[in-house]
């Protein structure tokens, strides 16, 4: 049973949260939420020395994108993705991410990584290279899926980059918390129920992360998504929205109208899986018109609402164990939710790895607040308000005295945000026993809510005006600066050896997949889709 009201002695949602926080503050219990597992997945466009999208293949010296666990590609062959192993601290996570960037820059042959979420100068849509994963069946599936995304939404939209934060509380939390809550479900069902509650609450509060960390208020005029004509000219080469926090998270970016009718309920794991399963098995007439195989070429994996579950955009995803051999839907059914993936973070342009410690600390504390707060089901009316809030904050989050829709009324953004941050502060104090900066991260959030000029989005616009640069010139300068920074660092001997070995091993594994006996692709695909 999902937790929807107080079950811990409090007589209100706020009372229940306070009761759980007091329990965590008891001697020895704070360790239950410290040192959970976390990881980062960071995308960056690969560009040439002049800032144009690279048309070179993914560098072989980085390994095989299909099989490398840490260095792969996202949508485009020119969109590398840096994936850290799970770590027990944010410092370890960012150090690993930095090491991956050092290793990559040593092998990029003079190319750069674009530092912003909004793209560099792109070629015609059909010339943006789709990621290539070889001729094995798993590789073909990944490439054809991306080809389908291009037909459905356009390739340029898939060139928008971001940071994903993966998080799971310590394993030791679940049995103790289940006992404290006097819950009778199995351990697996309890964990899944609580993490689905976290997902619902994060959906409710995702706007706050967009406000605090959105860093894409402007874009290069060469990038013309639907709706760009509503933006204002900042300079001859730059479009912007004066109060925007994240055009990436707006209806100009990922949250476009193509999935506007699709709602995947997170009110329980069963509802989530059933809704996703329906979307990946229900034909969409618009996509039927594209065709699946046309003149012998695969255009998409199928003509369903979603080709596979990864196509569904959401601010946060419940995720199964990575060790499962099933596709995500099957794994969620069999093993439940193990961790969550936060997907609302823009690239922080001025940080060489795209994200910093303070951001990770705040998001971690926010996730704990979402986990331990009561989490009633989200009904259709509330979902409409959530969607409206998210878009409003993305497009106008820094507008003075902005009010957000909630409970069929409206609340001032700053006031509401400060109330949430006050609740998050209790969890930051729990996490900050060793002076790791969680409390300081919460204080930075307070300052940004009191003064919108202290947000990253405001800083980007301020830099553009102060330096009198177009967005393209500004981002290209940062890309060059970041390259010099990484080339000035040295990997430890062990890490250099490990990453070099992984590159070689991934190439061998990918080549072995291509040599191994395999069924025809159509048969392979039928087997893959049977695992729903």
Spell out what each predicted region is.
Residues 119-121, 219-223, 383-394, 438-449:
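A glycine-rich phosphate-binding loop feature that marks nucleotide/adenosyl-phosphate handling sites
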């Amino acid at each position: 049973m999902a937790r929807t009201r107080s079950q811990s002695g409090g007589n209100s949602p706020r009372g229940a949260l306070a009761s759980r926080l007091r329990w965590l503050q008891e001697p020895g219990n704070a360790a239950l939420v410290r040192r959970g597992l976390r990881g980062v997945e960071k995308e960056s466009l690969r560009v040439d020395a002049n800032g144009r999208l690279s048309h070179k293949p993914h560098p072989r010296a980085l390994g095989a994108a299909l099989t490398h666990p840490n260095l792969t590609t996202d949508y485009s062959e020119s969109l590398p993705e840096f994936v850290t192993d799970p770590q027990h601290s944010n410092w370890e996570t960012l150090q690993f991410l930095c090491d991956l960037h050092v290793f990559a820059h040593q092998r990029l042959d003079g190319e750069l990584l674009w530092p912003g979420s909004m793209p560099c100068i792109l070629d015609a849509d059909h010339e943006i290279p789709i990621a290539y994963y070889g001729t094995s069946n798993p590789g073909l599936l990944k490439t054809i899926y991306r080809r389908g995304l291009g037909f459905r939404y356009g390739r340029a939209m898939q060139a928008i980059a971001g940071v994903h934060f993966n998080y799971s509380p310590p394993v030791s939390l679940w049995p103790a918390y289940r006992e404290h809550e006097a819950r009778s479900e199995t351990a697996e069902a309890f964990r899944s129920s609580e993490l689905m509650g976290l997902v619902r609450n994060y959906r409710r509060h995702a706007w706050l992360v967009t406000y605090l960390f959105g860093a894409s208020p402007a874009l290069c005029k060469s990038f013309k998504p639907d709706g760009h004509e509503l933006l204002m000219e900042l300079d001859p080469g730059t479009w912007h929205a004066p109060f925007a926090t994240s055009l990436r998270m707006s209806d100009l970016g990922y949250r476009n109208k193509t999935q506007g009718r699709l709602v995947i309920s997170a009110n329980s794991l069963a509802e989530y899986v059933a809704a996703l399963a329906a979307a990946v098995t229900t034909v969409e007439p618009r996509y039927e018109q594209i065709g699946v195989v046309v003149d012998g070429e695969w255009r998409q994996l199928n003509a369903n609402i979603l080709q596979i579950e990864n196509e569904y955009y959401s601010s946060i995803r419940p995720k199964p164990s990575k060790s499962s051999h099933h596709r995500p839907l099957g794994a969620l059914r069999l093993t439940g939710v193990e961790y969550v993936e936060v997907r609302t973070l823009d690239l922080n342009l001025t940080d060489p790895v795209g994200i910093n410690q303070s951001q990770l600390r705040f998001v971690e504390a926010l996730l704990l607040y979402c986990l331990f707060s009561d989490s009633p089901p989200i009904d259709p009316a509330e979902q409409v308000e959530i969607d409206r809030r998210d878009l409003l904050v993305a497009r106008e989050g820094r507008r003075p005295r902005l009010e957000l829709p909630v409970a069929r009324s409206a609340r001032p953004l700053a006031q509401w945000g400060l109330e949430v941050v006050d609740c998050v502060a209790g969890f930051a104090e729990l996490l900050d026993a060793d002076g790791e900066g969680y409390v300081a991260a919460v204080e930075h959030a307070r300052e940004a809510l009191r003064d919108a000029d202290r947000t990253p989005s405001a800083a980007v616009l301020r830099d553009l005006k102060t330096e009198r640069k177009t967005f393209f010139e500004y981002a290209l300068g940062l890309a060059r600066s970041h390259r010099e920074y990484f080339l000035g660092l040295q990997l430890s001997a062990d890490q250099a050896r490990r990453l070099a070995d992984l590159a070689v091993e991934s190439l061998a594994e990918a080549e072995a997949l291509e040599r191994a006996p395999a069924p025809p692709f159509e048969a392979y695909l039928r087997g893959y889709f049977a695992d729903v």
